Each structure stands twice: as structure tokens, then as C-alpha cells.
Amino acid sequence: MGSKALITSPDISSGQLYIKLPTFFHLYVWPFALFVYPYIGYVYQNKLYSEEVRYLTYIAVGTIHALFWLAGEWNTKVYCLMTCRKTDKVEQATHILVTPSKIGESSSVEPITKLVLPDSQTIQYSFSFQRKRFIYEPEKGCFANITFPMDEPSTIGTLKKSTGLTNIQSEIFLYRYGKNCFDIPIPTFGTLFKEHAVAPFFVFQIFCCVLWCLDDYWYFSLFSMFMIIALECSVVWQRQRTLTEFRTMSIKPYEIQVYRNKHWFPISTEDLLPNDVVSVLHNKEDSGLPCDLLLLSGSCVVNEAMLSGESTPLVKESIELRPEEAVIDVDELDKNAVLFGGTRVLQVTQSPFCKLKTPDNGVPAIVLRTGFETSQGSLVRTMVFSSEKVTANNRESLYFILFLLVFAIAASGYVWHVGSKTERSRYKLMLDCVMIITSVVPSELPMELSMAVNASLGALSKYYIYCTEPFRIPLSGHLDICCFDKTGTLTEEHMVVQGIAGVNRKDPYSLEKLSDASNDAILAIATAHTLVLLEQEGETPKVVGDPMEKATVENLGWSIEKKNFVSAPEGSVFYKGKVQIIRNFQFSSALKRQSSVSNVRVSGGSFKTFVSVKGAPEVIATMLREVPKDYEKIYKDYGRKGSRVLALGYKYFKNYIPENQVSDLSRESIESDLVFAGFLIFTSPLKEDARQTVQMLNNSSHRCMMITGDNPLTAVYVAEQVGIVEKPTLVLDIKHENEKILEWKSTDDTINLPMNPHKSLEASLYEKYDLCITGRALSQIINPDVIMSIFTHAWVYARVSPSQKEFMISTLKHNGYITLMCGDGTNDVGALKQAHVGVALLNASEEDMLEMQERARNQKLMGVYEKQIQLAKRFNLPTPPVPPALCHAFPPGPNNPHREKTQEGLNKVLEDLETKKASDVQLTEAEKAAERRANLANKMFDTLANASDDEAPKLKLGDASVAAPFTSKLAVVSSITNIVRQGRCTLVALVQMHKILALNCLITAYSLSVLHLDGIKFGDTQYTISGMLMSVCFYCVSRARPLETLSKERPQAGIFNTYIIGSVLGQFAIHIVTLIYITRVVYLYEDPLEKVDLEETFKPSLLNTAIYLLQLIQQVSTFAINYQGRPFREALSENKGMYYGLLGIAFVAIAGVTEFSPELNAKLQLVKMAYNFQIQLLATMVVDYAACWIIEELMKKYFRDNKPKEIVLRN
């Protein structure tokens, strides 16, 4: 059985079966137990070697044994090699090695579960990887991701006739799919700490501390070890808290009606299984749906905020009226019938044709997926199992460390060569060599990088931007292409109705009011929608649905009523009649149209069946009985002005069709032979920050493009408004309908140029014009080179389908460009997931977010206050006073003195405002702001007043969208610049850390080798003080905030390049020269030691003093010169913590040289220096700093790669 074919899943690249061996037979147990340790014992008892050799042998063997065990913890393949043996037979295997296909995810060894199935007594083999279950399929000889009944092709008719599960089926399904729950185990603190404690860098850091302890640096080593362990404990605690919060994301089980064995009865939602038929109902607890469901009958209004983050209610229609012979398509055609797990049901409407009556007046639905296989489960898995430790380019970092290792090996070789000629202890010599080699591995790098990314996450959350995959933040720092959807992204979500065109026979170009259209056109407008009336207990009924449709019906003056009735305003011919929508086909981005069937009765007349269709003009044109003369010119003319144009068609059926027969109508028969009713003209204003954001991205070396499903003329107009296109624009489209000939057209139709789909674009075309491509034209081009030529030079893509958006992003990715996609998280899911940086914009307001934050803050306060009350009761103390923020949550009284004061203050503000309004005095902006704050305070008053009656809220899904790794709760385009800003900041910090750590490591290696052999040592106090000051700088190095304006200059993306390596080596060379120079100067003032005793304890000397103070300045220059501030983030002087930390170190160094404070010098164990020597040492410090600065500036000027790629440039 080949390892590659063992698991068939796009998420897993390979797998291998293993048999776990008993503990004694593990490779890190039996060789040591049977041979190594008995031999060591024999040597020890017989004293065959010197004590020094035996001592070194014990340390070496202990280290090797530990490394044997740790190697298995670090690498799963090594673990399998040491603890298991391979097998090709699944019947024998106990474990399986799983290698994921995603870059950055680690391999995992998972146990294989064996279950005896009750129906056939066969054994089912399965394993779980990242909470995803894989089952062995004997006929295929491989493991496959668990499949659900709905994954197999099923007809609509089959699902409609579904009678639920039988007892035997439910028992089999329970074995196969398990319970419907999110089982996220929370490890204990000890378990998590053990996982962190065996991490390579942590082990390495502790190992280094132990080495320093062996070399008599106790204070410094113990202080470092304490800091490392404390930091790791804080990380473990944070991780444990995060896992606890993730666990609260699962929906609390509740009872639901299920149809099994042809009977309805209640069961817990945890016991639901695929193919169960359930009754969907709005429950009082407001719990989310327990799993993914397919609506069989009726309709629902749902809120998918927990899943997508979008709070706008959506209308879901069942598959009831779909043709029975049609095959179910939950990803496209039937997507609107899917109820996703975690979404809240706001309202259900039963169908009069439903044969399966529910006992609780709910609507029937069939279970599609359960547990972690649901859409909500997928999002939870992404959040739980996304890379927890953020790393840089691992390959580059490895090369960088290997490069530094060359210098360390040379230094340790020098120490061994010189030391072996003396009588020095081989133990100490080997210890020195190991310490030198370990000194070049920057053990602080993971911690520093993690701090930089966490700082960015925190900064983004202040803008209500949330990220589920933090490793993508550095990617946003070197973006090449930024793609934007139009509607709801660059333009506002709400549409303004301008009127209707094409209805005035004398002047078809004129724009008329909707109410001035013909009666048939008015009826078409009033019924061509999917709006419903949402009625919730205790709330005013409200209309929910597409914002554009709401705006249209409101403009017309009609109203939406219960049971899909629409009522006309007084004065209309339909005022006292009846209009009921009996069938809806929701708008589909693939089909580009929406249609409705209604039964209409004008007052006193008979019923008629009426069809209304609206959609893209070019689509509706194919359905019209007769296309008007200027049809194309009219809609293109309005499109050029930036309006959104929808064509409207209608027809009456010859015979009245009752509601119970409407399901017999096919969509094709409905959407044909239509009468043209006009063009609905909408305008969607640009978002306030759209133009400014696009301009900032253009000016900061990014290529901005628009990818939209709207028509090309409107898209080009909006692109011109925001600055995506600057030159005259040509649109590539098919020449005539139903033809494959492509043609370039100007937006005013004055230019027509042929296009060869087999030939790349000519330079003369894109140098003179900006280009727009339609989805129809793109589908005609097959040649990959031509496609890439278009993607390189086009700026606007219009009338593209969701799948085409995804194809475009993936093509750009595969050609080496770093991409960003910004969309609404609904139609753009595929493209958002494909992009390196996908950003879903949601529609919450800042006031909503502030109110939510205030509510959360007060709930935390409530928890703290309740604990205070419990403690007071336990110790018989008086009840503590209510905090001011919670005063409205408790009744007034002596224990709540703040409530009356707060109420009095609010009443006074409101009285003053009312007085001003009554006297018709114009309110100032400040007073308007005060009024808004007072209204918000009133809302908070009501919220807090009811807070004591509610349970403490738990963290739920809603911050993150299932569609994208980045989610902006606010629908502002400036979220993109905020993400780019933080990405650049993190990327700059990454490069900076590599440089600083590399220089520190090289200087340390030199100090431990050449300087150490010259008898130069540092005292414990010197190490501790400089180490503490360096810790402050390391902490602050990644805390610099980004600048508001994005610079045209791009940050250096890589690590292993001429600029970084050249700068590090150049600065290192300067430091070495100054160290050698000052050593020789010292020998002019004191004689060098004839014989250096390396084992001698530290004694202050002029050489030690000079080297220590010079190295302090070298550390200052390393941080200050390699610090990258403007134009990406605040300058060194603005990063106060680091600035003052470096000033502190410089002060210590200069004060030590000038002997400014004898007490400080005594504390630092420095000796007195001659005046001339002080001058020379100060001059050397200045030369060292200045020379390093010059090296850095020269390398930066001539070798830094900060030029944008060609695709970013307009020509």
C-alpha cells in the first residue's frame, strides 16, 4: 500500500501506518538500559579512566539520551522510527502518521480506532486529525474524509419523501458520525507546559542557562532561567484561557423535535445524526441551529452573524417548489435552502403544501452535516488549529543560522586549538566550545516574532479587525496586488433609487418616478423581490431582505405584509385588491436574475397570475418577447454614469394558477416571453474613505484592481471615481450575443478594436488605455500566457462569477504575486480564501461595537462584583458598594449611591436638550454630539437594567467570518490600510530582529573565544545589569507603532540577501576592529599577563573594564542603527521604552568611562582609568558607532530590495 494513496484528502499530503511498540522496546529505552548504563556503571566501579573523563562521559551520555527522547518530541517521523514499526496492513496498525498539505502545519501521529459495526459485524477503522474524521474504505484500500449522505447525488423528489431514520439506521450512523458536538478538550496546565517545555528553542534556552551556571555565572543564569520559565508559563496560561474560550463556542444542547420511525418525538441536539428530519423553530433561548440543515418546506428568516459575522437577517427558501427530478446542489442552486449550524432562526413560515406536519408548528428540515463537519465546526477548527506559533520564512532563517554557524565553528576551533596546547581542563575547554557554538543560535527569535505579531493583533482589534490566521499578518506587509469588490466594499451597501427609465415613449432616456410608471410596471416592481415581514415577540415588525429591494418597495410606497402579501398605497388601482407572491426564485450571482410568481386581484375583479423578473439587462434581453429599439443604448448610458441598472420584465399567464399548482411551473416557462417594463436605475454612493484608501494604496506601491459582478460601464465609472483607473478605458467583451468573437470597446462606443484570444496584449494598447475585462470575454480565452497578459495589464473585471474571481486570485498567486482580496464574505468566499490576505467587510457601525464592548466590560465587572459579595458573606463583612458602571443594574439604596446621581445627570442633559429644541434654537455640532451620547447612554441604561436578569454571556462566534482569515466588523475600506500598515510593521520588526540577534550572537562568539583566551571576563553583576537593560530593549523593539501614512517605499521582504548579510558582516567587522584596537591600547597602560589563568575567578582589570564598556556601546549601536523606524513605523525617539532604555545603557557606558559616579563604577566592578585612556576609549566608542552607521546606510542605499514588481507599475 503506497503511503501517498493511503489517505485521500486535499488537506493531507500523505500517511503511513505504524504498530506502536511496548515502552521497553523504544529506541531511547532498551539500548541505554541494556548496554550504555551498565557499561557506565562498570567504568565507574572499576575507575578505568580519570575522574574528569568519567565526568564528561556522564554528561555526554545523559545529554545524548535526553536528545534521543527529545528528537521524538520534535519530529513525528523520528518518533515513529523510535517507538513504532511500519506496516502495510490496516488490521495490524495501531497508529497512523499524518502529513498535512498546508505549509506551516505539523505532522501528527494519531491512534487508529477500531469499532465493530452492529449491522454487519465488520470492523470499522478510523482516525481523527484536527477533529476531522477519516474512515477506512476496504474497497478503495485507503482512508477518506467521512462522507455524508448528502455528498452523494440525490434528487429533490427523494429528499421531499424522506421519512427520517429508522432505529437500525440511527445506530449505524451513530457509530459512523458520532455525537453532534464540538468536543474541544482543555489540557491541564501541566500537560500544556510539558508540550512547551520540550519545544526545541525552550530546551536550547535552558541548556544555555545550565552551561552558564557550569561556568560560574550563577546570578545571570538563574535570572535568565527564571525569566524564560515565567514567560513560557504566561504563554501556557494564555493558551489555556484561549482554549477555554473556544470551548464556549459550542452551542449548548437543547431539545428539538425529530422524525424517526415515522413518529415525532423530542431528543437532545447532541443526538442528531445526518439524514434526521427535524422541526426548525425559533426557540425562546435564542440558541443557534445545532448543525447544517436543508430546508424541505416553508421558509425561514435567519441571522448568520455567528458564522459570517454579518448581522443582516437573511431569507431562506426551501426546496419544496424545485422540480422533483432535479439533482440537489447545496453549493450553488440550492445554497439558499441551507441553514448553517450556529445561525439563529428569527422566524419560520409554514407551507400550506407540506405533507409532513410538525408537532410544534416548525418547518421540516433534513440534517446535512454534524459536529466539526458543519460550516461552524470548520470555522472553529480553523481558529483552534491555525498555526499558534508564528514563524518567519523557515528556510531563510535556517540558512541565516547556518551562515552564522560557520563563524561559531571557526571561533570554537580557535579556542580548542589554543586551549589544547595548555594544561587547561578538557572539561572546561569543551564547555567553552559548546557555549560558543550555541551562542549563534538566536534563541529569542521565536519569542520576539511572537511578540511582534501579537502586538499587531492587538492593534488591529482596536479597529474591530479580527484575524483567525496570524501567520498571514507579515504577508500583508509586502503585498503586490489589492483586489476589491464594488458593491458593499467600495460603494455603500444601501442603494438609492433614482427612478425608472425606458418607459416614456417620447423620451425613453428620461428618468421617471417609479409611481409614474404603468400599472403593470408598478406591479412588477412591487412583486419582483424576496422581502418578508419579520415579527418577533416584543419588537416592532420589520421588513428583512436585500437592501436594494427594500429601497425599491419603499420608494414605490408599497408595504410588505404577512404570508407574502404586498399592499399598495391609497390611490393605487391595486389599493383594495390582493397581491400575494406565491413563488420566488431568489437572485443568483451565477444566473444574474430574480423572478417571482404572484396572484393578483384588482378590486372587484378576478384573480390573475402574474410573473415579474428583474436582472442584468443583457440577461433579461434574451427573455423578452420584443427588445425595444434603444434598449442597449439606454442601459449603457446610465451605466457610464455609475448607476446600477436592472432590467424589468413581466407577463400574465393566460389561465389563473392556484397556489397549490405553482410547483408544477418550471423556471424556464416562467422566465420567457416577457414584456419589457423598464430599467430600474439605482445609485450607490461611494464610501467616505474609499477614494482616500485606494489613493494611499496606489501611492504605496500596490496595484489596486476591481473585481465585480456588476456591469462593466458602472464598474469603470466607480473605478474612475476611486482612482483605480486614470486613462480612457477599453472594455473587452464578446462582439455579439451567442458569438465567441472578442472586441475592445471604449465606454462611449466610439472605439472598436478586434482582439485575438491567442495572442498576448500589445504594449501600444495598455500604454494608451486602462483595460476592463468581462467574465464572458475571460471565459473565451484559454491560452495561459494570454490570460496572464490580461491579468498583468487589466485594472477592472466586470460581470465575473464567484468561480472566476477565485480563478483570478489563484492564477496571480501561482505566478508569484502576493494578493489581497476584499469583499463582502458572501459571493466572494472562494476568492477570499484563495488570497494570501482575504478581508471580509461586515456592516456593523462603530456605535454598535462600542455598545457591545461596553456591555462586555460591564459583564466582566458584574462577575468581579459578585465574587466580592460572596467573599464578604463568607467572612461576615458588609456588602461592598455597587461600582458606578453597574449602578443601573441594581435597585437604588444606601449600597448603590451612584444610581440617583447618574440619573439626575442624564435627566439634566436631556432636559437642556429638549428646552433648546422647543425654542427652535439651532443645535451646535458639540450639542448634537452630546445628544447622541445621551441617547447612547439611555440605550446603555436599558441594557444594563436588564443585565442582572440574563446569564453571563459566553464568547460566541461572530467576530470572525468563515469566509476569510481577516474580518472587519466595520464596513470601512480603511480596514485594508490598517492591515497593510500592521503587516509592514511586523515585517520590518522581523528583519530588524534577525539583524540585531545575529550581531549580538557574533559578538558573543568572539567574546567567548578570542577575548576569553586573552583573560577577559565579565563579572556576574556586569552580566546581570547589561542583561536587564537589554531585556527592556528587546521587549520594546517590536512595540513600535506604525505610521498613519503608507510610504511608497516597500519594506525589505527577505532575510538571506546581500543587504542583510553585508550589513551584519560589515558592522561585525567594525566591532572586531575596535575591540582589537582598544585591547592594544590597554596594553600601553598595563602589561599583558604572561600566563592567562582561565580558571581564575573574575577580578576587575583595565582590560576587562575597557572591553565591557565598549561592548555596551556596541550593543547600543546594534539596536539603534539597525532599528527600522520611518517611513514604516515610529522613529526610535518616538518608541519611548526603547529610546530611554538605550539612553540608559549609553549613560552607564559613558558614566563608566568618565567616572561620573564612583559608586556606579564600584557597583559595576570597574577599575580607575587614566585621563588619556578615557579620551581614547570615548573616541573609539564614537568611531565604532559612526562607522557602523555608515556601513548600514551604504548597504541600505545600494543593496536593499525595496522596488515594487512590474505589475504594480501603471505602464
UniProtKB/Swiss-Prot annotation:
Annotated spans, P-domain: 464-493, 688-845, 956-971
Residues making up the signal peptide according to the UniProt record: none
Residue ranges, Cytoplasmic side: 1-23, 76-191, 238-397, 1079-1100, 1158-1174
Keyword DNA repair: no
Disruption phenotype: Increased levels of intracellular calcium. Impaired ATP-dependent calcium transport in endoplasmic reticulum (ER) membranes, but up-regulated vacuolar calcium transport. Sensitive to ER stress inducers DTT and tunicamycin, which inhibit the protein disulfide bond formation and N-glycosylation, respectively, and is thus sensitive to accumulation of misfolded proteins in the ER. Stimulated calcineurin phosphatase activity. Cells conjugate to form zygotes at a lower efficiency than wild-type and they do not sporulate.
Coiled coil: none
Any GO MF annotation of the entry: ATP hydrolysis activity
GO CC entries: endoplasmic reticulum; endoplasmic reticulum membrane
Binding residue positions for ATP: 485-487, 587, 644, 710, 824-828
UniProt topology in membrane: Multi-pass membrane protein
Region described as N-domain: spans on this chain: 495-685
Localization, UniProt: Endoplasmic reticulum membrane
GO biological process: cell division; extraction of mislocalized protein from ER membrane; intracellular calcium ion homeostasis; protein transport; sporulation resulting in formation of a cellular spore; transmembrane transport
Region (Arm-like): 846-955
Function: Endoplasmic reticulum translocase required to remove mitochondrial transmembrane proteins mistargeted to the endoplasmic reticulum. Acts as a dislocase that mediates the ATP-dependent extraction of mislocalized mitochondrial transmembrane proteins from the endoplasmic reticulum membrane. Specifically binds mitochondrial tail-anchored transmembrane proteins: has an atypically large substrate-binding pocket that recognizes and binds moderately hydrophobic transmembranes with short hydrophilic lumenal domains. Involved in controlling nuclear calcium ion levels.
Family per record: Belongs to the cation transport ATPase (P-type) (TC 3.A.3) family. Type V subfamily.
Name recorded for this polypeptide: Endoplasmic reticulum transmembrane helix translocase
Record gene name: cta4
